[in-house]
């Protein structure tokens, strides 16, 4: 099958599977949004505060990025959803014309375990910025996201920690379902914003199944698997994803939250996942690390001081086309800010290109052979 676009549907949001792997559950698809088409499987860069750290929107477009993320919790704290709305919405505010997804802020709130209190109505917590008391409920999370104006918004959920006992996870699953119902009732921009539900359940298979069954009944435009990559070993993440993904509708996009390593993405794509996000490419860049063909290189290492090759001769990114490993090593040693921009551009391009290669392999039914080493290699310790 070729990679050409299908006819744009009448509905503002729809998902089509173009091809499937004959040996795994991997699939190549297209997710239509009001701000463009997302070709899946796809890695999505994270721009927590309405920017991809050190990278301009123009530079970001050059990486092949299609959909990006911003964070409701952080944008509520600074600058505030009212300012974003007054600017014309998130797209205009940050100068990004493609699709945007906003997380509900639930994960960030629940990570503030010492600063919060949970009740059925919502969560009260103290801002880590200034100690101010803040209240966030399903209704408020949706109202904030409605004002921000992203294409895809996430339901407010309760993310149980890892490890957690069964009763704690059960309570989180049941509350997540009740909160989703409230999110649906509060959501008043259904024509131009797709609300995704988030499957919880921790490491308990039956609770994952319970969560998926309950949330699928809401018939939402898409679903995410949450509560993973929160401290579990890699093999447990793979087990959860492999078990949970088939429980989600085939005709809806499936999003695995907070995952973005090579191996984890390949394994998840084989299970049927379409979308990924992670801060890895920019975070590694800020620490002087480059992602190169499945490896992680520390450019501060002395072996790069007189290495005048590009990071990756096969990479088409701006960094690899114009600069050497030695130059990047020099910038890092001199603590020049340009180093972080150039490495971020490359790392984002690398992960997007990686998922694009997987997509092409699926379209031509070569996924299981071309990515066999990633599918069969043992989990890292």
From Swiss-Prot:
Single annotated GO MF: tRNA-guanosine(34) queuine transglycosylase activity
Annotated spans, RNA binding: 258-264, 282-286
Superkingdom classification of source: Bacteria
InterPro entries: ArchSynthase1/Queuine_TRR (IPR050076), TGT (IPR004803), TGT-like_sf (IPR036511), tRNA_ribo_trans-like (IPR002616)
List of residues binding substrate: 103-107, 157, 200, 227
Record: active site: 103, 277
EC number: 2.4.2.29
Key words, A-Z: Glycosyltransferase, Metal-binding, Queuosine biosynthesis, Transferase, tRNA processing, Zinc
Catalytic activities: 7-aminomethyl-7-carbaguanine + guanosine(34) in tRNA = 7-aminomethyl-7-carbaguanosine(34) in tRNA + guanine
Pathway: tRNA modification; tRNA-queuosine biosynthesis
Secretion signal span: none
Subunit structure: Homodimer. Within each dimer, one monomer is responsible for RNA recognition and catalysis, while the other monomer binds to the replacement base PreQ1.
NCBIfam families according to UniProt: Q_tRNA_tgt, tgt_general
PANTHER family: QUEUINE TRNA-RIBOSYLTRANSFERASE
Family note: Belongs to the queuine tRNA-ribosyltransferase family.
Protein name: Queuine tRNA-ribosyltransferase
Lineage: Bacteria, Bacillati, Cyanobacteriota, Cyanophyceae, Gomontiellales
């Amino acid at each position: 099958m070729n990679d050409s676009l299908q006819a744009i549907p009448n509905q503002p949001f729809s998902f089509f599977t173009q091809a499937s792997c004959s040996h795994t559950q991997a699939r190549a698809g297209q997710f239509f949004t009001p701000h463009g088409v997302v070709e899946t499987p796809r890695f999505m860069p994270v721009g927590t505060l309405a920017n991809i750290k050190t990278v301009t929107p123009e530079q970001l477009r050059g990486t092949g990025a299609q959909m990006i993320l911003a964070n409701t919790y952080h944008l509520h704290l600074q600058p505030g959803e009212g300012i974003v709305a007054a600017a014309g919405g998130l797209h205009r505010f940050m100068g990004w014309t493609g699709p945007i997804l906003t997380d509900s802020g639930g994960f960030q709130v629940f990570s503030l375990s010492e600063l919060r209190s949970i009740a059925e109505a919502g969560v009260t917590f103290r801002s880590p910025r200034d100690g101010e008391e803040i209240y966030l409920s399903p209704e408020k999370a949706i109202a904030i996201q409605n004002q921000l104006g992203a294409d895809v918004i996430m339901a407010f959920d309760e993310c149980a920690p890892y490890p957690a006992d069964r009763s704690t996870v059960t309570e989180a699953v049941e509350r997540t379902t009740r909160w989703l119902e409230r999110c649906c009732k509060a959501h008043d921009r259904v024509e131009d914003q797709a609300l995704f539900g988030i499957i919880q359940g921790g490491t308990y298979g039956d609770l994952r199944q319970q969560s998926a069954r309950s949330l699928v009944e809401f018939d939402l435009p898409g679903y995410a698997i949450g509560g993973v990559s929160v401290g579990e070993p890699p093999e447990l993440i793979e087990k959860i994803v492999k078990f949970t993904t088939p429980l989600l509708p085939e005709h809806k996009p499936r999003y695995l939250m907070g995952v973005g390593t090579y191996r984890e993405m390949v394994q998840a794509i084989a299970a049927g996942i379409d979308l990924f996000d992670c801060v890895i490419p920019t975070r590694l860049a800020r620490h002087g690390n480059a992602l190169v063909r499945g490896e992680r290189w520390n450019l501060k290492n002395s072996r790069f001081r007189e290495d005048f090759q590009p990071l990756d001769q096969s990479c088409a990114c701006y960094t690899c086309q114009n600069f050497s490993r030695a130059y990047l090593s020099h910038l890092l040693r001199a603590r020049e800010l340009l180093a972080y921009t150039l490495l971020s551009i490359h790392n984002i391009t690398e992960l997007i290109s990686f998922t694009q290669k997987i997509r092409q392999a699926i379209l031509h039914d070569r996924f299981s052979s071309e990515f066999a080493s990633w599918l069969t290699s043992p989990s890292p310790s």
